[in-house]
Amino acid sequence: MASEDKSKALAAALAQIEKQFGKGSIMRMSDNQITENLQVISTGSLTLDLALGVGGLPRGRVVEIYGPESSGKTTLCLQAVAEAQKLGGTCAYIDAENALDPVYAQKLGVNVEDLLISQPDTGEQALEICDMLVRSSGVDVIVVDSVAALVPKAEIEGEMGDSHVGLQARLMSQALRKLTGNIKRTNTLVIFINQIRMKIGVMFGNPETTTGGNALKFYASVRLDIRRTGGIKKGDEVIGNDTRVKVVKNKVSPPFRQADFEILYGEGISRQGEIIELGVKHGFIDKSGAWYAYNGQKIGQGKDNTREWLKANPAIADEIERKIREAVGVKIEINENQGDEEFADDAFDA
């Protein structure tokens, strides 16, 4: 009898909550709205998509990407924007640093004509614009570049040298409290780019920290630490960077994995380079000395030549990528135009 009374009381409470706050304000975990598959947007890096465990950056969540200067933070964000646009998504870029290069973005595959861009005057304006775009439900990806450039209005209007302790941290904390619920409800991916600072007087442990206080660390579902690990040379010329990304926080899959890939100057993340590395690792591409082979046919001597061969034969590159994704159990949406190409008759001709 007590159990029946509890059930009736719970049913009455649920009905009252839905009446007061609207349908869907409380539900069981078995309801479709909660258990539907997580939607993701590719980072543009196959290796990083696999390291994230779900095939990309999760929609309806906050993501933080941080690292030293010139480590590839903006490149990674623009690649994610390009991937979202390929699937028909609408993207916005809040350029608080006033440093976005549209020519470079276009080289990475971003449709700059359709990209929404804002260059706000203050941190409050930037975050208010972000909140309004999220609440519109019409934008799929929003990039905020960067947290360090979100200067509070009081600091801009004050004198140079004035002390404004904790202003930016309070601004971020207040904004994220408002944003998080709307982001989840509208299934928007919001990416914050952040910079690194050094703590003063740290004797033990890591002296590095990110700007904007601790709020973003808590609210972010995914945090990526991106670093440049070396240069890529073609002869004496440096043509790109070796890059490593560590997944330091991940609420949608196991964290602490890392991804290594190449960023080529003027091109962005080298998809072909990743396919070669992962293809060899999973046994789809054979490597003998300097030669690489696929299905028993030689496709290139040295990584540079093999990369160029895969660029010239995108259908075969797509096929190898699909095999890699199937091998690790991670799939992702593919643009309708992809995969329809026929193999060239002379694709394997040496």
Swiss-Prot record:
Family: Belongs to the RecA family.
Location relative to the cell: Cytoplasm
Residue stretches in coiled coil: none
Task of the protein: Can catalyze the hydrolysis of ATP in the presence of single-stranded DNA, the ATP-dependent uptake of single-stranded DNA by duplex DNA, and the ATP-dependent hybridization of homologous single-stranded DNAs. It interacts with LexA causing its activation and leading to its autocatalytic cleavage.
HAMAP family: RecA (MF_00268)
Pfam family, one: RecA_C
Record key words, sorted: ATP-binding, Cytoplasm, DNA damage, DNA recombination, DNA repair, DNA-binding, Nucleotide-binding, SOS response
Species in which this protein is naturally found: Chromobacterium violaceum (strain ATCC 12472 / DSM 30191 / JCM 1249 / CCUG 213 / NBRC 12614 / NCIMB 9131 / NCTC 9757 / MK)
DNA damage among keywords: yes
Binding site for ATP: 67-74
InterPro entries per record: AAA+_ATPase, DNA_recomb/repair_RecA, DNA_recomb/repair_RecA_CS, P-loop_NTPase, RecA-like_C, RecA-like_N, RecA_ATP-bd, RecA_C_sf
GO biological process, one term: SOS response
Keyword Transferase annotated: no
Single GO MF descriptor: damaged DNA binding
Protein name per the record: Protein RecA
Chief place where the protein resides: cytoplasm
CC terms in the record's Gene Ontology section: cytosol
